Amino acid sequence: MEQITGSIKQGGWDAVCILGPTASGKTRFAVELARTLSAQWKPCEILSADSRQVYRGMDIGTGKDLAEYGEVPVHLVDIVDAGTKYNIFEYQRDFSKAYTNILERGCFPIICGGSGLYIEAATRGYELYEVLPDEELRACLEPKPMEELVQMLKELKAAKGEKPHNSTDWDTKKRVIRAIEIEMAQGEQREPLPLPQKVLFIGVDVDRDTRNARIDARLQARLEEGMVDEVKRLLESGIPAENLIYYGLEYKFLTQYIIGELSYDQMVKGLGTAIHQFAKRQMTWFRGMERKGVEIHWVKR
């Protein structure tokens, strides 16, 4: 920890990102780091990069142990209602607001999470754009021949100094029109969102057998804590079963159990296997980040 804190204090970083698969202990590590830096350097606050902890009322199933943070402020947890669909574009917008607020108060941001897409949206220095369908533009473009649409798309990209890089943009008229729609909408966007440009990535990892054992023990503990009752309450509040199933993992399997699609034993076994596979996919994502040039400093916990 001393080597890490020294690097942070001397490195001129915009933020630190603590990432890792589920059950790796990354939250505990992030809190320890925040407390150490707050005592030695400047106040630190945590920005969650978890795609499901944003939802209110989804606590046990997402491992949202707010007590673990203690006195350390945490952002981007409990910000939208369960049953809604919060997307990556909204997350990047909300992250930027929270990140800017932390900096304005003279604090240091520590990003913590295991959702690779959210981590990249927050730290890779590019802004995502949610481009809604423009029916008026589509009606105008549809009668045009394919050759004219392709040329229009090439000119739009050239005006931004870009070269066509995705051959699938050109294979159907529908794809070309959608690509034009996106290019034109992006050209009208506001100034880029403030996002951290220089980020120190620290990965928290455990060996596979230990990780899987932790996952199984944690699953049993959460079931004993009332995870089934939590999902029942969400269903009783009026959230459709399919909306909870959409969230995957705990909420998918427990909902299927409650509505009679799975037995209890099938639910427990299937959920345990699914979480093991999920952790493996998380590690695959992080290795992919490394292949793209992101330097992740791995620590064992």
Language model feature labels by segment:
Residues 1-301:
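Phosphate/pyrophosphate-binding catalytic cores of soluble transferases and nucleic-acid-acting enzymes
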